């Protein structure tokens, strides 16, 4: 049996542009992609914190150090510049490996610069003021 597990999460990135007339996808700063171990062409889910919209698309590598998080194509009707998003990729693993798996979590600032990393997708960056998913 294979289990679908969170592989990587870029948490609270700021959308820098949205272009309806682009071929499609999400463009990500190459620094963010490498920190999260997300490859060009990889399937990702995008959750918009501002409006609750969720979508799936594939990744295009953006300029390293640019901070770009660009929403392209039809998704530009759902996600807008300035919105905060969570970008997630998943991996399918055999049961035994899934039980040992730890995802990569990348925290960014308002300019999409990396300010921290972790392996617990429910744990916020210390000092961020966000609540842990472990507490109810």
Swiss-Prot record:
Domain of life the protein comes from: Bacteria
Pathway recorded for this protein: Cofactor biosynthesis; (R)-pantothenate biosynthesis; beta-alanine from L-aspartate: step 1/1
Principal subcellular localisation of the protein: cytoplasm
Binding residues for substrate: 57, 73-75
Pfam families with a match to the protein in the record: Asp_decarbox
Cofactors demanded by this protein: pyruvate
Localisation: Cytoplasm
Coiled coil: none
Catalysed reactions listed for this entry: L-aspartate + H(+) = beta-alanine + CO2
One GO molecular-function entry: aspartate 1-decarboxylase activity
Keywords annotated in UniProt: Autocatalytic cleavage, Cytoplasm, Decarboxylase, Lyase, Pantothenate biosynthesis, Pyruvate, Schiff base, Zymogen
Co-factor binding details: Binds 1 pyruvoyl group covalently per subunit.
Modified residues (Pyruvic acid (Ser)): 25
Subunit-structure text: Heterooctamer of four alpha and four beta subunits.
Protein name: Aspartate 1-decarboxylase
Biological source species: Acidothermus cellulolyticus (strain ATCC 43068 / DSM 8971 / 11B)
Gene, per the UniProt record: panD
